Amino acid sequence: MPEEVQTRCVIVGGGPAGMMAGYLLARAGVPVAVLEKHADFNRDFRGDTIHPSTLELMHELGLLDEFLKQPHQEVRELRAVVNGEAVPIADFSKLPTRCKFIAFMPQWDFLNFLSSHAKRFPSFQLHMKTEVVDLLIENDRVVGVRAKTPRGEMDVHADLVIGADGRHSVTHTRAGFKQCEFGVPIDALWMRISKKKDDPEQSFGFFQHGKLLVMLDRGDYWQCGFVIPKGGFEEIKARGLPQFQNEIVSFAGFLHDRVSELDDWSKIKLLTVQINRLRDWCRDGLLCIGDSAHAMSPAGGVGINLAIQDAVATANLLAEKLRNGPVSVDDLRQVQLRREWPTRLIQGMQVFVHQRVVTGRASGNKGSLPFIVRLLKWFPILRQLPARFIGLGPRPEHFRSPTA
């Protein structure tokens, strides 16, 4: 027989959406259990950008000063090398926030920080190595989840299940939710290349006629993302590592003396880029948020921050009611109603960028700079527009959930 556990809310997935929702609900006095299938949060090539909107939330929680003591890099302006010319893209200095920068921080540090603070609330539980495999359903209502643990099976019964288990979500699959898929013509290859002290400062990446190499400063190494045509990885491997290394050097020449570190394809990880969203985020007893509700492209690094905004809206709308008992389907729909149009807007922009600008294929247009990039170069005030879209996003959330 499975072990039986009872709580008010169970959250499937200990990523940014799940951990923030768990923290906020526990802060409001709601008994909550977060179930994470892995033994720790250490994953390579996850979203590591903490945008000004998220930093503002940390300030509102009174956690910002301690949070910024964690190892991180601060980027106050996004710059890119476009067709060989360095150009500014976004200027965060005029944002109406306490922190006018993007913080680059390993996601595991962010999640460890949040979980350590959440554990201070008596109503919070975190179960690691607990993999949810199914929903518990009674009379067409989701009443909990079944999970595998090192001790055996465990049934967690709850008034609300929050699915925050990512784009390969068990919760939305078992619930029978239908997705709207948006074709994206690219995938991305992620890799590490060592960093030297005399390397040029690089905040964004290199763009050449439809192709893109993103470089993120990780202190002693570069985390590099190379955009390729959708499904094109096998063709790239067939051409061989030397040709792939040469292509990387053609974007960032200063890597010529160490690109040989990529001496095996196992050091190069494929990220299949998806943009999709659920038609319905909820049913009786279940709400999906974050990547479980809407998978984002890496473009702009907005996925983690959109997921956190979902979590804040969830706590704002549901915490008070959850403290007193179950919530209705109409209550759950309020979260989708609030968060769906920001999701649609950002996904629409990402689809446009991938279909018209970053395609992973060499473009026939060999002009020096795209017109919109020339405008950003000529008129500095225009750089505030991408800064607001990336740094704050549409409809940024603020805390309104109660405190226990």
Could you describe each region identified by the protein language model?
Residues 212, 275-277, 293-305, 341:
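Glycine-rich phosphate/pyrophosphate-binding beta-alpha loops
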Residues 282-298:
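Short FAD-binding loop at a beta-strand-to-alpha-helix junction that anchors the flavin cofactor
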Residues 316-404:
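C-terminal helical "tail/cap" subdomain of flavin- and related membrane-associated enzymes
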Residues 130, 141-155, 160-273, 277-282:
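Conserved FAD-binding catalytic core of PHBH/FMO-like flavoproteins
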